[in-house]
């Protein structure tokens, strides 16, 4: 027999939706937008690391 806990009682409403699928696209477009923004963020970080993005007055030294 499973033991009841306060955390389990708080999380039970989330688990009650398990297996239910909302018809249509749902939040897929929103996920696509956030994936695109994350890609832009990663590209900016990569350009700073490669020093191909020049920032005025900002020097980057990777040596120890």
UniProtKB/Swiss-Prot annotation:
Transmembrane ranges?
Answer: 29-49
Annotated organism of origin: Rippkaea orientalis (strain PCC 8801 / RF-1) (Cyanothece sp. (strain PCC 8801))
> Transmembrane as a keyword?
yes
The family database entries (PANTHER family) matched by this protein are listed as:
PHOTOSYSTEM II REACTION CENTER PROTEIN H (PTHR34469:SF4)
Q: Which gene encodes it?
A: psbH
Give me the Gene Ontology terms describing cellular component.
Answer: photosystem II; plasma membrane-derived thylakoid membrane
Please name the GO terms of the biological process aspect recorded for this protein, alphabetically.
photosynthesis; protein stabilization
Which HAMAP family does its entry note?
PSII_PsbH (MF_00752)
> Briefly, what is this protein's role?
One of the components of the core complex of photosystem II (PSII), required for its stability and/or assembly. PSII is a light-driven water:plastoquinone oxidoreductase that uses light energy to abstract electrons from H(2)O, generating O(2) and a proton gradient subsequently used for ATP formation. It consists of a core antenna complex that captures photons, and an electron transfer chain that converts photonic excitation into a charge separation.
State the oligomer form and interacting partners. Answer: PSII is composed of 1 copy each of membrane proteins PsbA, PsbB, PsbC, PsbD, PsbE, PsbF, PsbH, PsbI, PsbJ, PsbK, PsbL, PsbM, PsbT, PsbX, PsbY, PsbZ, Psb30/Ycf12, peripheral proteins PsbO, CyanoQ (PsbQ), PsbU, PsbV and a large number of cofactors. It forms dimeric complexes.
Respond yes or no to whether keyword Transmembrane helix is given for this record.
Answer: yes
**How the protein sits in the membrane?**
Single-pass membrane protein
Q: Which GO terms describe its molecular function?
A: phosphate ion binding
Family statement drawn from the similarity comment of this UniProt entry: Belongs to the PsbH family.
Q: Which UniProt keywords apply?
A: Membrane, Photosynthesis, Photosystem II, Thylakoid, Transmembrane, Transmembrane helix
**The organism's place on the tree of life at top rank:** Bacteria
Coiled-coil ranges (or none): none
A Pfam family (short name) is: PsbH
- Its recorded name reads Photosystem II reaction center protein H
Where in or outside the cell it occurs: the entry states: Cellular thylakoid membrane
């Amino acid at each position: 027999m499973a033991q009841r806990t306060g955390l389990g009682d708080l999380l039970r409403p989330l688990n009650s939706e398990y297996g239910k699928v909302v018809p249509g696209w749902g939040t897929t477009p929103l996920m696509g937008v956030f994936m695109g923004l994350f890609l832009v963020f990663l590209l900016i970080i990569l350009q700073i690391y490669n020093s191909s993005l020049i920032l005025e007055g900002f020097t980057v030294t990777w040596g120890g």
